[in-house]
């Protein structure tokens, strides 16, 4: 199951849908436990606040969910460089790390500022290229090499 989490002003995390657009009214930890009870076999946990920023994973969120459930958790949102993948895989009890920005932001860095992203959802982010400077683009082969060198299992 995929859980999209947004941190609230009180420090809690609420579950959202539709790329963080729609509130569910469910607190993330409670929802993670419920989906496990309902038979989910794995959770893809996205920090909407960190997604696409390159600022690093939300360790608090990922750690809380991993401690709350007995099913595998895949961390997603915030990876800015290959070393972030290594750090998450080493420091947190996750079953995997989902990445995207470090693989494709090179194209956005050099795209036309007047490009029309209206159907993409996060329009202001894409048009302003906010935080793209924190993304260190890489190739899958380089990321795999780094992980293998550090004896981190890859699929």
Where are these regions (language model features)?
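Conserved, mostly hydrophobic/aromatic
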Residues: 1, 35, 43, 65, ...
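Active-site-adjacent beta->alpha loops and helix N-cap segments on the catalytic face
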Residues: 2-11, 51-66, 81-86, 106-114
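Short secondary-structure boundary segments
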Residues: 3-5, 47, 77-78, 100-102
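Short loop-to-alpha-helix "cap/lid" segments that border enzyme active sites
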Residues: 22-39, 56-70, 79
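Hydrophobic alpha-helical segments typical of transmembrane helices
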Residues: 31, 61, 84, 139-142
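Catalytic cores of alpha/beta
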Residues: 60-99
